[in-house]
Amino acid sequence: NGFSHQNPGFIDDILRRQSNFSNVYFPSDGNVTLVCLEEMLSSVRQINALVAGKTLEPRWLSTELARQQVSEGLMIWDFASDENPDIVMAACGDYPTKETMAAIDIIKTECPAAKIRCVNVSSLTTMGLGTLRNVATQKKFDEIFTHDKPVIFNFHGYPQTLKSILFNYDVHSHRFDIRGYKEIGSTTTPFDMHVRN
């Protein structure tokens, strides 16, 4: 629905605060959403926001994997990944995840030899990727995103918001191509908004 429904300004406001009391959850599917809600409702002394669509989306993870995803905040999706990747494709959010999985499928069809790692990020804080209880360390960040491979990151927010969070890590910015919301478009579908942006 364009700017009125897809404006990520609230996400930006939370994640740009200099604080250590807020989490923003970006569940990739219904199972992850349920686990996120469980985490949010059991937490105290922190602000939690959940960013999720209102339509039925693919179910990517079992309940067990959803719990692991939410606990760690980011995870390599082995079922959509290859060993020793040439490129890392990351997603944060339900629609961005669906789009990233479709992109991987297209690449695998057109270029079967391409080795891709699929990474999903389900939560962010001002301090980094993950939750307040489990912010990804530099070591974990490097293990997941590699030291030198290019990363295409599909984000459900302003690209600059994610760039400011990545600043917490020793990252060469030329490796990361962050795709997100740019306020271009009108009342339309999420896919069309992403194409326009």
Language-model features: locations:
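Active-site nucleophile and cofactor-binding loops and adjacent substrate-binding regions
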Residues: 1, 25-28
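Thiamine diphosphate
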Residues: 1-12, 19, 36, 40-197
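Inter-helical turn/loop segments and adjacent helix faces that build the functional surface
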Residues: 21-23
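Short beta->alpha linker loops
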Residues: 28-32, 95
